[in-house]
Regions:
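Generic N-terminal leader/processing signal
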Residues: 1-2, 215
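A periodicity- and composition-biased signal for non-globular, repetitive helical segments
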Residues: 9-10, 36
């Protein structure tokens, strides 16, 4: 793939990104800022979202900005990904299925100078998408239909930089521009009386800063451990919200200044590396959503997540493409930030497995692209009674292009 083709591809992906299907159809996206997107790329998704201790010159790891210092001297990486999913909703004996597709991320990584790497990319921060209704009997001759719809989301273009001041220490910083629109609408339709509607609208324009660090401890030539940590401080999201209440005879509008807050986030983890063949690790993430407001009224629950994963790479170099496939699997358990009923939230767990398949040039010597494929099962179960269970079967597909942009060619 030449530079012109890559430029065209990047331009198209950037242009269609905000307009692609947001890939969500969940009633739980009506809470807060919606369903939080997976803030990771191809290899992380194969390992349950693991990433605080991962670093590699072959892949981009946006989970920890300190990993950008591992960028290769002579190459530039481009990575893009999509996902396809089938969702099952269960409420009592009732079941409904839905299918979604989404554009998930676009990123690039390159070396600025010795021991300094940079990454630039685009991915969603959260997604909102739902539409459902329920019918109630208000009396002998009157019924009401409650309807709920929502759409929108928050997007996150970012730029990150990392520096390796010591052979075993890297520090990094990612700055993101957070922007988007969120709309919720709730309506009540009566058979014999006045209809009512409440509309929630928010426009978000803010920023997000993530600070990362990684430390490598080598035990011998075969064994090492990489420790990683990331911190992001919370602040107002500069989100002006509007609530409009209407019925057949009147309309009221309320303006809310700074209707949303971004939570502070802390995460830490490690990766144990054995001969660059086996890698295994654990991550923990905590987000202080209980200090965040949504439309100036409701608050969230503190979110925590534990991830674990393993990677197996049979060999570094081989003429047999199948011997260079890298295999990964992982799992996670999380408590989402959404408060759905009487102070109670949900439990979420997921398992994933996948592989990365390299493609070689005509001389079978250099990999210009790596295909990432993973399957994922996710279950979301509410702690409150009378709520909906959600189960996801998801296929993640990503591709990394490895271009030798900085190689000096010799003319004979």
């Amino acid at each position: 793939m030449n530079k012109r083709t890559l430029t065209i591809l990047l331009t198209i992906l950037i242009a269609i990104g905000p307009y692609a299907d947001n890939g969500i159809n969940s009633p739980y996206s009506r809470y807060g800022v919606g369903i939080l997107s997976n803030q990771s790329l191809g290899i992380n998704r194969q390992m349950g979202g693991l990433g605080y201790g991962l670093r590699s010159p072959k892949y981009i790891n946006i989970v920890n900005p300190a990993s950008f210092s591992q960028a290769d001297t002579l190459t530039m990486l481009f990575e893009a990904g999509i996902s396809l999913q089938n969702v099952n909703f269960k409420e009592g004996d009732k079941r409904i299925n839905a299918k979604n597709a989404s554009f998930d991320y676009l990123a690039m990584q390159f070396r600025l100078r010795n021991n300094i790497g940079m990454s630039i990319g685009f991915l969603p921060y959260s997604r909102v998408g739902y539409s459902f209704s329920q019918t109630s009997n208000e009396g002998a001759s009157e019924t009401s239909i409650d309807t709920y719809t929502g759409s929108g989301g928050i997007y996150q273009p970012y730029i990150g930089i990392a520096w390796k001041p010591l052979p075993n220490l890297s520090v990094g910083l990612t700055g993101s521009y957070i922007y988007g629109n969120i709309t919720h609408e709730a309506g009540i339709n009566f058979t014999n009386s006045t209809d009512m509607k409440k509309l929630y609208e928010a426009s978000i324009k803010s920023y997000k800063l993530d600070f990362g660090v990684q430390y490598i401890k080598k035990f011998d030539e075969a064994r090492s451990v990489t420790l990683g940590a990331v911190y992001s401080f919370g602040h107002d999201m500069n989100a002006d919200a509007t609530i409009t209440e209407t019925n057949s005879s009147s309309s009221k509008e309320y303006k809310i200044k700074d209707g949303f807050k971004l939570p502070s986030t802390f995460g830490a983890g490690f990766i144990y590396n054995y001969k660059d063949k086996w890698k295994t690790g654990v991550d923990y993430t905590f987000q202080k959503w209980s200090s965040s407001d949504f439309f100036g009224m409701e608050k969230g629950l503190d979110r925590s997540k534990v991830s674990a994963g393993v990677e197996y790479s049979p060999t570094k170099l081989s003429n047999n493409i199948f011997k260079m496939i890298e295999y990964r699997m992982g799992a996670y358990y999380a408590q989402p930030y959404t408060e759905i009923k009487n102070g109670k939230g949900c439990e979420e767990y997921g398992i994933s497995a996948g592989f990365s398949l390299p493609f070689f040039n005509s001389n079978n010597r250099f990999s210009h692209a790596i295909l990432h494929v993973s399957g994922e099962f996710v279950s979301i179960r509410p702690k409150a009674s009378g709520m909906i269970d959600e189960s996801y079967l998801r296929l993640n597909i990503g591709i990394t292009f490895n271009e030798s942009w900085f190689v000096k060619m010799k003319v004979r």
